[in-house]
From Swiss-Prot:
Taxonomic lineage of the native organism: Eukaryota, Viridiplantae, Streptophyta, Embryophyta, Tracheophyta
Induction cue: Negatively regulated by ARF3/ETT in the abaxial gynoecium.
Biological processes per GO annotation: carpel formation; gynoecium development; ovary septum development; regulation of DNA-templated transcription; response to temperature stimulus; transmitting tissue development
Gene it is expressed from: HEC2
Natural source organism: Arabidopsis thaliana (Mouse-ear cress)
Gene3D superfamilies in the record: Helix-loop-helix DNA-binding domain
Protein name in the entry: Transcription factor HEC2
Amino acid sequence: MDNSDILMNMMMQQMEKLPEHFSNSNPNPNPHNIMMLSESNTHPFFFNPTHSHLPFDQTMPHHQPGLNFRYAPSPSSSLPEKRGGCSDNANMAAMREMIFRIAVMQPIHIDPESVKPPKRKNVRISKDPQSVAARHRRERISERIRILQRLVPGGTKMDTASMLDEAIHYVKFLKKQVQSLEEHAVVNGGGMTAVAGGALAGTVGGGYGGKGCGIMRSDHHQMLGNAQILR
């Protein structure tokens, strides 16, 4: 399975995770905002197509009409017959960005039980201070890796090295989105510092990012919260 197939599988997995309830009752939805309904609260999520680098103009098929983002077609159906390395890389980058845009529309919820280390049976544990300290250090690293796997789109389906590489791309994507939000706030004359401070405090204060995230009052909050967790 090549990289394009892996990215396509990741995109399909992310789409399956999208909640079923989108605000598609409005016949003329605002293309700059997508409203998503989670369990009991409505969370607005920011999507700015003007900053997208996707070269595709086809609307996503087989999905809810309320979604307003561009779809990166399958490499086998849209790329020219003579595909060079540059076109393949551009298509993979576009597909990766599509996956990330789907991922940022999802609320972050990590079950603390899912990141606990597996229980070891019939294993003698050394009580030597150095061994204990080394074991605790390894456990902390493993716990952070498991958390990161659940934050990175498709991270639970990858090996650690691939997941870390994908995390780098995800952080770069989130940084670009934060810059877009800051530019958007400057153009509108808004105070981005105050908005960002409140969003990051609310997100980080929610522990693993579960129910403590609360209700995001603007479409800036979710993107900034995702970026802060990955920093």
